[in-house]
Swiss-Prot record:
Binding site for substrate: 264, 321-323
PANTHER family registered for this protein in UniProt: SUCCINATE--COA LIGASE [GDP-FORMING] SUBUNIT BETA, MITOCHONDRIAL, SUCCINYL-COA SYNTHETASE BETA CHAIN
Organism of derivation: Chlamydia abortus (strain DSM 27085 / S26/3) (Chlamydophila abortus)
The protein's enzyme class: ligase
Name of this protein: Succinate--CoA ligase [ADP-forming] subunit beta
Length: 386
């Protein structure tokens, strides 16, 4: 689950990680009150959306007077934000963050992330901040340092010394850096985060380290342990079908292809996406209905996939170990019989009650193409999608 910037800053502030004061406004009137609270005559106004690239796409405005700040609040609250990270979708802007300007001497990057290659949390630092870290890694690898954390000791003193030396922080700045890194790592573990990113982390002219922007992602599977974080979920920032899938308990991720997929098991679902791509097709979604979905859940899953107007072909790929193929067939038929315009459908059923499942579909009169092979089914679905 992603947090908005202001929510991320609230979390980091609770761990004594320093940053300039900030306030959130959802109207011009609130923006006016915010100016009085902050006591500023100039500042930065930023849209609060679950996407990066805000500065490059008009989502951040530097204002040099109270009038400019209020004008920026009004302008940003009426926009729908689009960047290369929104997959072409326009995200609504319901809040903006207002914060004072800072005299910056240097910008850095600091993050704690899950390193899937090494299967451990990793601290990532860079002497170049305020830019895309991917770009820095490619062009200036010598300006980036990564430190792997163990699940037991978590962070050693020699690692802290290595990081402070690499960043060139001396004296009080170095002491601040040590404490900030310790607190950030503690925050990462305490909240089951998969990403804590500060970009930029700045050193002021006075030598203080401050967080100017923060991004936090919490492991969805651990949210039951963090009720105070769970309530921060903002469905307005997600695809409508993603939100609906969560409500009905399905693992669904919207993609940008035109072949709708309904599969049981995450591994089989990933393999289905891969083989469609191998044969020149593109999936419209990832959907894992699980191993024990009921007929009602299958109906909801089929309806969910077909609600995507980009879906031109439906590919059902079920391996029925625990799953009952007849329940899948009944759920499919129940939905299809209510629709006027049927799209081409490819069905691969294997396992428990497979013959009964096929019979249910065939007797319904719904035009479906059956296959016993995943490879053949994928080829057929791709051909129908062209």
């Amino acid at each position: 689950m992603h947090l908005h910037e202001y929510q991320a800053k609230d979390l980091l502030t609770s761990y004594a990680i320093p940053m300039p004061p900030y306030r959130v406004a959802s109207s011009v009137e609130e923006g006016r009150h915010t100016l009085n609270e902050l006591g500023i005559n100039a500042g930065v106004v930023k849209v609060q959306v679950h996407a990066g690239g805000r500065g490059k796409n008009g989502g951040v405005i530097v204002a040099k007077s109270p009038e400019e700040i209020l004008a920026a609040v009004d302008q940003l609250l009426h926009m729908r934000f689009v960047s290369n990270q929104t997959s072409g979708e326009a995200l609504p802007v319901e809040k903006v963050l207002i914060t004072p300007l800072v005299n910056i001497a240097a910008e850095y990057y600091l993050a704690v992330i899950m390193d899937r290659k090494n299967r451990c949390p990793t601290i990532m630092l860079s002497k170049a901040g305020g830019v895309d870290i991917e770009e820095v890694a490619q062009k200036y690898p010598d300006q980036q340092l990564t430190i792997s954390l163990t699940p037991f000791a978590r962070l050693y003193n020699y690692q802290l010394r290595q990081m402070i030396k690499f960043m060139g922080w001396e004296g009080d700045t170095g002491k601040q850096g040590v404490q900030m890194i310790k607190n950030l790592v503690q925050c990462f573990y305490d909240n089951d985060a998969s990403l804590l990113e500060i970009n930029p982390l700045v050193r002021t002219q006075e030598g203080d380290l401050l967080v100017l922007d923060a991004k936090v992602t919490i492991d969805d599977n651990a949210l039951y342990r963090h009720p105070k974080l769970e309530v921060l979920y903002d469905p307005s920032q997600e695809n409508v079908r993603d939100v609906l899938a969560k409500q009905i308990g399905l693992s669904y991720i919207a993609l940008d292809g035109n072949i709708g997929c309904l599969v049981n098991g995450a591994g089989l679902a990933m393999s289905t996406l891969d083989i469609l791509k191998i044969h020149g097709g593109s999936a419209a979604n990832f959907l894992d209905v699980g191993g024990s979905a009921t007929e009602q859940q299958i109906q909801e899953a089929v309806s969910l996939v077909l609600s995507d107007e980009n879906v031109e072909v439906l590919f059902i790929n079920i391996f029925g170990g625990i799953m009952d193929c007849s329940a899948v067939a009944s759920g499919l038929v129940a939905v299809m019989q209510t629709r006027e315009n049927l799209i081409p459908t490819v069905v691969r059923l294997e396992g428990t009650n497979v013959e009964l499942g096929k019979e249910i579909v065939q007797c319904s009169g719904i035009p479906c193409k059956f296959t016993d092979s995943l490879n053949t089914g994928a080829q057929l679905a791709v051909a129908l999608s062209k």
